[in-house]
Design a protein with these regions (language model features):
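Membrane-interfacial helix-loop connectors
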Residues: 1-16, 21, 89-126, 135-141, ...
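Membrane-interfacial loop-to-helix junctions in multi-pass transporters
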Residues: 68-83, 110-115, 177-183
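Alpha-helical transmembrane segments of multi-pass membrane proteins, especially transporters
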Residues: 1, 21, 43-47, 51, ...
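Membrane-interfacial segments at transmembrane helix termini in multi-pass membrane proteins
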Residues: 164, 168-178, 183-187, 193-202
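Hydrophobic transmembrane alpha-helical segments of multi-pass transport and channel proteins
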Residues: 124, 128-129, 150-159, 185-201
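Hydrophobic alpha-helical transmembrane segments in multi-pass integral membrane proteins
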Residues: 54-65, 157-172
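Helix-loop-helix hairpins and the membrane-proximal interhelical loops
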Residues: 40-84, 105
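C-terminal ends of transmembrane helices
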Residues: 24-38, 131-138
Length: 202
């Protein structure tokens, strides 16, 4: 998330990474998987594809926001955005994808930082769905792990949601209106630190 905020929205990087995607993709297709360079090619392919995808998401979001009035969303309470984040992450099965979409919407001016924080907070719950799916036909131990992960994320989300308004004011004061992308990524890091502080002693 920090890498996306620092690089993905500051520079037009799709033209740089498109050739990397092509070259590394060809290498993956023809090089023996047992060779060390194969794994490096997979790494560069995945990283480059991430930034190319982000570029298309960003341009698509900017076009959508320019033709859509999202002002009415500001009237909704924070719980709506928490539920939206949980639902979106449950559908796409990736909190990273939710973060990329939310950063794009925030960068385009479609949503406020407060709305974005609610969406990212909700993604903590939505990301647990894939563990439930993976453990559906598995051992009882896998189901317990999935349930424990859900409860940890649920408690963390509830705790942070209760104090979301003062946390928003504090984060917004630290970063200001010009650094909202970094403020959102910092908030996600803060949520993870809260989770650690709540459950690490146990």
């Amino acid at each position: 998330s920090w890498l996306l905020a620092m690089v993905g929205f500051r520079y037009n990087i799709d033209q740089l990474f498109l050739p990397v995607v092509a070259i590394s993709g060809i290498g993956i297709a023809f090089i023996n998987p047992d060779r060390k360079i194969y794994h490096w090619l997979k790494f560069f392919f995945s990283l480059s594809f991430l930034f190319v995808s982000l570029s298309y998401i960003k341009s698509g979001m900017e076009g959508w926001v320019s033709h859509t009035d999202l002002g009415f969303f500001s009237r909704y309470p924070s719980i709506v955005f928490v539920l939206l984040g949980a639902s979106l992450t449950g559908v796409v099965q990736s909190s990273s994808a939710t973060m990329a979409l939310t950063l794009s919407a925030l960068h385009s001016g479609g949503i406020s930082l407060y709305m974005a924080m609610g969406i990212i907070l909700g993604s903590e719950i939505g990301t647990t769905l894939k563990l439930f799916i993976a453990s559906a036909n598995g051992l009882a131990s896998k189901k317990r792990v999935a349930l424990a992960n859900f409860l940890i994320n649920l408690v963390t989300t509830l705790v942070v949601w209760i104090i979301l308004t003062p946390v928003y004011r504090l984060v917004n004061q630290w970063f200001g209106d010009q650094q909202e992308l970094f403020a959102l990524v910092f908030f996600q890091t803060l949520v993870n630190l809260v989770s650690l502080s709540l459950f690490l002693p146990f």
